[in-house]
Amino acid sequence: GVGVVTILASGFSESGPQGAQREQQLRQIARSTGLRILGPSSLGVVHPRNGLVLTANAAFAEPDVPSGKVFVASHSGSMIGALVSRGKARGVGFAGLVSVGSEVDLSVGEICAATLDDPGIEGYVLFLESLRHGDALQAFAREAALRGKPVIAYKLGRSSAAAEMAATHTGALAGEDDIADAFLKGLGVARVDMLETLFEVFPLARKLPLAGASPACGQRVAVVTTTGGGAAMVVDQLGLRGITVQPVAGETLARLKEAGIPGSAGRVLDLTLAGTRYEVMKKALDILLQAPEIDMVVAVVGSSARYQPDLAVRPIMDSADHAKP
């Protein structure tokens, strides 16, 4: 028989007391029959590898939905289409996409947990309007961390207006955003501020355990730059996020000096315009990435890179295969 049903219709808890009653009836049906429910307010599921497109989202009428290793779970049905178009533009493919809706039965955590042992999935992207079924989400996130599969989330509700919209959309309980932020951080879930960042942060997250996922997680960051002003902006933003820039150790400074690279004992390695030469930036990156006191390196390039990207961007790209990000 049928084991799972998807409910596209809205008009449940988000619509008031009568809708909440209808939602409770759905829960009772699920409990008494063993039927699992995806939704309400779900636009369905997509499995690119198998060619399954079970969704009312018109974005999937587009041919060649990219297949890959990222699994998406979203409270918003329209956002799975938006994420596919953005991922496609960045060369990101998907192992599956699920529009979860109001989570009357099946939740984000339970759905994602069911895929944890799929070798074709390397990480997760979540679009969250609220935090429901916290125990299931917590259990999933911890198991994902143990398997080295990063979880990246974009969660609405930072402002009171956005929280109100989320509540009227899927009946979500808004709650205090700082509590949600602490909850996600404690699970090692990386919360991003911009939608595009969901995919941009993914390669970094795969290389470095996220905070909260492991007690051995390293956050010692070195900054190398061709522009002092740009580096100061980066250091400022890192500081706002509780990340301290690591000064380069004396032994590493000595190695840089031997390689003919100027350096000082400050928190930023400023190569000045000399860093626009490939061999200077590449050698500096090699030495910093090998330094035991550093877990990751942020390279900051100036405006010269816009017109001659090979000067400063190419050595960064050529360092991407290093074990450290």
Question: Where are the regions a protein language model picked out?
Answer:
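Catalytic-core regions of core metabolic enzymes
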Residues: 1-325
